[in-house]
Amino acid sequence: MSKTHFGFESVEENEKAKKVAGVFHSVASNYDLMNDLMSAGMHRAWKAFTIAQANVRPGFKVLDIAAGTGDLTKSFAKAAGPTGEVWHTDINESMLRVGRDRLLDKGIVTPSLLCDAEKIPFPDNYFDVVTVAFGLRNMTHKDAALAEMRRVTKPGGRVMVLEFSKVWDPLKKAYDLYSFKVLPWLGDKFAKDAESYRYLAESIRMHPDQDTLKTMMEQAGLDAVKYYNLSGGVVALHLGTKY
């Protein structure tokens, strides 16, 4: 069986899926709190930029992959309105349940679906916008997931990937210190789970950089791929169009 990485660890491909699932079962209940703490609230600005770039309009069909607690789903559902169709999906049952309950608490009624991004259960050319935020780096076969995202996107539609990326060189030393010392400490102090947040830091370092991900999206068949660096490259938003 082929090997892949789980953070800095080399594991069998089927083992990675189980390990990633374990991480997100563990962090689901504290996910929103930890996002605010770890990013000093900046994740809200990154998501707001993504929502603005998506430009979802009434009647749009939107697929939110690895949607977790539903921040993007909520905004997309409001923008698409009653004539639209917005799917809140995740491969992790715990994250999906937390997100679904959170959406319902806010009065957002939209379908939630347990979904593997490498095998998306929708027909070709179905969605106007497909998004994945902070989920691609956890996928075993990123190329397969990107190809699936393109497949279900309508001609003229867009695939959007919001993900941690490679920081600008002047920030690297401080960012490494924060990632490998502060993040696990925050995880231990506020979620009683240092290991999951150590994996977070390692998974970010193992994720392709901005230009590599751009090439991967092009190889998946997307056109006019571009990206925006946010917060000095801590995060990047990639956009590709299906022609």
Curated annotation (Swiss-Prot):
Pfam family of the protein (one): Ubie_methyltran
Binding site for S-adenosyl-L-methionine: 69, 90, 116-117
Pathway membership, UniProt: Quinol/quinone metabolism; menaquinone biosynthesis; menaquinol from 1,4-dihydroxy-2-naphthoate: step 2/2; Cofactor biosynthesis; ubiquinone biosynthesis
GO molecular function, one term: 2-methoxy-6-polyprenyl-1,4-benzoquinol methyltransferase activity
Cited PROSITE patterns: SAM_MT_UBIE, UBIE_1, UBIE_2
GO biological process per UniProt: aerobic respiration; menaquinone biosynthetic process; methylation
Keyword Transferase attached: yes
EC number: 2.1.1.163, 2.1.1.201
Catalysed reactions, semicolon-separated: a 2-demethylmenaquinol + S-adenosyl-L-methionine = a menaquinol + S-adenosyl-L-homocysteine + H(+); a 2-methoxy-6-(all-trans-polyprenyl)benzene-1,4-diol + S-adenosyl-L-methionine = a 5-methoxy-2-methyl-3-(all-trans-polyprenyl)benzene-1,4-diol + S-adenosyl-L-homocysteine + H(+)
KW Iron (keyword) present: no
Keywords: Menaquinone biosynthesis, Methyltransferase, S-adenosyl-L-methionine, Transferase, Ubiquinone biosynthesis
Enzyme class per UniProt: transferase
Family per similarity comment: Belongs to the class I-like SAM-binding methyltransferase superfamily. MenG/UbiE family.
PANTHER family linked to this entry: 2-METHOXY-6-POLYPRENYL-1,4-BENZOQUINOL METHYLASE, MITOCHONDRIAL, METHYLTRANSFERASE
Function statement: Methyltransferase required for the conversion of demethylmenaquinol (DMKH2) to menaquinol (MKH2) and the conversion of 2-polyprenyl-6-methoxy-1,4-benzoquinol (DDMQH2) to 2-polyprenyl-3-methyl-6-methoxy-1,4-benzoquinol (DMQH2).
Protein name in the entry: Ubiquinone/menaquinone biosynthesis C-methyltransferase UbiE
Species of the source: Burkholderia cenocepacia (strain HI2424)
